[in-house]
Amino acid sequence: MSRAPKLTLNLQFPAARSWPEHKALLPRATVAGWIKAALFADGELTVRFVDADEGRTLNRTYRGKDYSTNVLTFAYAESEDDPVTGDLILCCPVVEKEAAEQGKPLIAHYAHLLVHGTLHAQGYDHEVEEEAEEMEAIETEILAKLGFPDPYQ
């Protein structure tokens, strides 16, 4: 029987002053549970919840895109044998806006984006159709096990 992956989690919430209701939805144990559900190997991750300015700056600096995005993943493992290491950056106002536009609970959207970002940290991508289909199927399966509906419906 295989053991569940171990997670070392650094949770940062500099946006808490502006988005206290988001921080209240995201206690450490909840965030860790969602990430562990998406980890296939031991991991060391930092999750940082930011405002629009920091999100835009990071997206512009590292992706060349001058706007805030919902989640950025910075993966640092150099080989498949290394533990999963990375930073997940979630932009609170973008996540809130998307959840409202999509008619889904904020907590469900955060769960989806944390699972999505964790998969990116493990090398999954969605730049081509086949990869996108595989990644979406994995996300949907993980979220169902966590009690959330299919985020793509």
Swiss-Prot record:
Which first-to-last residue range defines the signal peptide? Answer: none
| Cofactor annotation remark | Binds 1 zinc ion.
Which residues take part in binding Zn(2+)? 116, 120, 126
Required cofactors, per record? Zn(2+)
Give the family this protein belongs to, as stated in its UniProt record: Belongs to the endoribonuclease YbeY family.
**HAMAP family, from UniProt?**
Endoribonucl_YbeY
Q: What is this protein called?
A: Endoribonuclease YbeY
| Species name | Paraburkholderia phytofirmans (strain DSM 17436 / LMG 22146 / PsJN) (Burkholderia phytofirmans)
**Taxonomy-wise, where does this protein's organism fall, top ranks first?**
Bacteria, Pseudomonadati, Pseudomonadota, Betaproteobacteria, Burkholderiales
Gene name tied to this protein:
ybeY
